[in-house]
UniProtKB/Swiss-Prot annotation:
Residues 1-30, 81-104, 166-201, 264-279 are extracellular. Glycans are attached at residue 8. The gene is OR52W1. Keywords: Cell membrane, G-protein coupled receptor, Glycoprotein, Membrane, Olfaction, Receptor, Sensory transduction, Transducer, Transmembrane, Transmembrane helix. This is Olfactory receptor 52W1.
Amino acid sequence: MAETLQLNSTFLHPNFFILTGFPGLGSAQTWLTLVFGPIYLLALLGNGALPAVVWIDSTLHQPMFLLLAILAATDLGLATSIAPGLLAVLWLGPRSVPYAVCLVQMFFVHALTAMESGVLLAMACDRAAAIGRPLHYPVLVTKACVGYAALALALKAVAIVVPFPLLVAKFEHFQAKTIGHTYCAHMAVVELVVGNTQATNLYGLALSLAISGMDILGITGSYGLIAHAVLQLPTREAHAKAFGTCSSHICVILAFYIPGLFSYLTHRFGHHTVPKPVHILLSNIYLLLPPALNPLIYGARTKQIRDRLLETFTFRKSPL
């Protein structure tokens, strides 16, 4: 009883938060480890193997494959930023997270999400250059160019996401220590704040629209250029070959943005009509499903990656 009263009090900079997982599910949420456990394992194995294969095989040291390795590293970081804590909450029940650790997790989740969106845009630009300007492609897109792009995307992600935890940290009073979520999501923490959170909410909304909106516009523009270039090709075989080089990337884009769109819409417009466990489920699917699917998509649809993985895991030697 005393503990319940304490959790419902107002706290001045709490030392920790308590993550409860899926509100209302109780012990039944333990079964969700059978879903998220394999998803995380798949993300670990796939996103660990893909950069290793690109690193080992010098023939894959090309812009397209280097971007794949960067995407895999980002996916690995994103999945690892939430999955261990998620599985701990599902299996062991509510757990405490130090206040500072919660803010750090908030930063990494949003920064890596922004980074992934930026990498998908860079990959779309790479394909547009390869298909639209094939003769100039080796000059336009180099390994150094990919390195600078990755650095710029990382700096952009850090710069725009740093205000998230800083804005939360400036609040002094919280109405509770209990977060009804599986990780320290920005809005889940802000809901506990006692005070005016309008500036924080507006920044979060503007940031979501700016990152996703600008990247989606860039991706759409890149594929518009690709479509225009493909239509200029003389044969259907050439059309199919050009489309084949983009099909994996299109699948990855859909796997990233569609769950994100559903998660965003249910949170912003279905807050009072969609059950909270559904919000949390969509949020976790949005962050964990793409890292699990991306290596499968590229491993299955990109011949060079597929062949190199088969050679690695079956101990076959590539032909001379």
